[in-house]
């Protein structure tokens, strides 16, 4: 029997036609069915969210021995636990007996987990320690042999500088290979402190009525900022004009993109949007400019302090260092519903004044009650509703195509960054093209795998 039922892909034989990438005619567009088709969503969950690397958590969220943290890989509940020796393990958060979730809170500290359903007990490395009422239970000889009834470990589980990723597919390439050039951007965030990063207390989780790709695109959409977030831009500009009232010292949205910026599309669907700040002196880490220059060089220091960065690690997380510093994690619930969870991040050992400013900037722009997030969610809802208008089939992505650069631009060359495509303006849309090219490649591989699986089933019937 198949581990997961075969997905019917018979209507997807012409999937190549869903993405138009024509450099001769200048047409770059995506068919809107990719946001609404149930079979495509099922393939995405199985092959992108469960069959490739996804972000799980940050090590600072499981800091102590015996701490645990719960999350998801696609549809499957995951438990990350630090055992008594300090080792991290990632396991399916389901009892090996009858499948009940073991850990039912987001986080905690336990040396063992006892299933509330039938009382089986596991240690925090996943080993089955005992079952309830074992005497004269009549278990088969094969019961609990060679770890047969231990918790199921996640097939691949790796960390990059504190960021934890997992995959249910044992054959994925190494995490370092998957992240590729984006590690240089991650290093900019982590390098702000010799002690690394930490996730601060507090979390905001919300859902919106729309496909997951809407937020995957939007976090690197520089074109929407002045339209959707005009109220925030006006508010921060008003504060700047009345300096006495600007206790938050928010980063200037009114000057977004006016001092330079751009975007990059990388292999494996990753993206980066960046801008040159109009007021870098209000960044929490601005006092460390000389230290960064000495440690990393002038070019890297400039990128770390004077430039905002929205980094999408495809498919499910943004690392943002801009109006606030945050980790934004998306989780598809259904083809037209998505959950988003955001955390404020900061360098370990940050000065109290800088930490307070960082938190206030984060609260100002983000959170479900911030001045920006609700605006984005309304546009996601409106887009998903608009996709029902199937007579208008395409999303256009040609903005900036006349000046896209295939490969690195001058700003990327400053730090040896090697993107697949560079947009020289923040409003350019070529980075979406790179992301959707990877999506299409993944979907074609998924369809081929499903057809092969269906064929083998037919032979064995």
From Swiss-Prot:
[2Fe-2S] cluster binds at residues 95, 97, 115, 118. Fe cation binds at residues 224, 229, 376. Coiled coil: none annotated. Keywords: 2Fe-2S, Aromatic hydrocarbons catabolism, Dioxygenase, Iron, Iron-sulfur, Metal-binding, NAD, Oxidoreductase. Binds 1 [2Fe-2S] cluster. Binds 1 Fe cation. It catalyses: benzoate + NADH + O2 + H(+) = (1R,6S)-1,6-dihydroxycyclohexa-2,4-diene-1-carboxylate + NAD(+). PANTHER family: 3-PHENYLPROPIONATE_CINNAMIC ACID DIOXYGENASE SUBUNIT ALPHA (PTHR43756:SF1), CHOLINE MONOOXYGENASE, CHLOROPLASTIC (PTHR43756). This is Benzoate 1,2-dioxygenase subunit alpha. It comes from Acinetobacter baylyi (strain ATCC 33305 / BD413 / ADP1). The lineage of its organism: Bacteria, Pseudomonadati, Pseudomonadota, Gammaproteobacteria, Moraxellales.
């Amino acid at each position: 029997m198949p581990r997961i039922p075969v997905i019917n892909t018979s209507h997807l034989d012409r999937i190549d036609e869903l993405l138009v990438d024509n450099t001769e005619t200048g047409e770059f567009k995506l068919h809107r069915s990719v946001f609404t088709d149930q079979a495509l969503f099922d393939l995405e969950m199985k092959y992108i969210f469960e069959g490739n690397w996804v972000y799980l958590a940050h090590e600072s969220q499981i800091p102590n021995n015996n701490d645990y943290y719960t999350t998801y890989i696609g549809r499957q509940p995951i438990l990350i636990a630090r055992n008594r020796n300090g080792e991290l393990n990632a396991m399916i958060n389901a009892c090996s007996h009858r499948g009940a979730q073991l850990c039912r809170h987001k986080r905690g500290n336990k040396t063992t987990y006892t299933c509330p359903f039938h009382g089986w007990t596991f240690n925090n490395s996943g080993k089955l320690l005992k079952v309830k009422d074992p005497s004269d239970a009549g278990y088969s000889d094969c019961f609990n042999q060679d770890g047969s009834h231990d918790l199921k470990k996640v097939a691949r589980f790796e960390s990059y500088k504190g960021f934890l990723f997992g995959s249910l597919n044992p054959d994925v390439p190494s995490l370092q290979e998957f992240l590729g050039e984006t590690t240089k951007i991650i290093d900019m965030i982590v390098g702000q402190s010799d002690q690394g990063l930490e996730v601060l207390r507090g979390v905001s989780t919300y859902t919106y009525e729309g496909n997951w790709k809407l937020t995957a695109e939007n976090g690197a959409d520089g074109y929407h900022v002045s339209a959707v977030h005009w109220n925030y831009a006006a508010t921060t500009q008003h504060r700047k004009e009345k300096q006495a009232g600007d206790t938050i010292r928010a980063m200037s949205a009114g000057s977004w993109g006016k001092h330079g910026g751009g975007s990059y599309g990388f292999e494996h669907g990753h993206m980066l949007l960046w801008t040159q700040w109009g007021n870098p002196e209000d960044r929490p880490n601005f006092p460390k400019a000389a230290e960064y220059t000495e440690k990393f060089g002038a070019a890297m220091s400039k990128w770390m302090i004077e430039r905002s960065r929205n980094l999408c690690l495809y498919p499910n997380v943004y690392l943002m260092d801009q109006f606030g510093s945050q980790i934004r994690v998306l989780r598809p619930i259904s083809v037209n519903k998505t959950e988003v969870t955001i955390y404020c991040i900061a360098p370990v050992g940050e000065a109290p004044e800088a930490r307070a400013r960082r938190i206030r900037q984060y609260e100002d722009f983000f959170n479900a009650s911030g001045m920006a997030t609700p605006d984005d969610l309304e546009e996601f809802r409106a887009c998903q509703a608009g996709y029902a208008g199937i007579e208008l089939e395409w999303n256009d992505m040609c903005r900036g195509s006349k000046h896209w650069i295939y490969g690195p631009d001058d700003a990327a060359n400053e730090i040896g960054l090697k993107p697949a495509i560079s947009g020289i303006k923040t409003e350019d849309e070529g980075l979406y093209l790179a992301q959707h090219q990877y999506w299409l490649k993944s979907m074609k591989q998924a369809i081929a795998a499903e057809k092969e699986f269906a064929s083998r089933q037919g032979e064995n019937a």
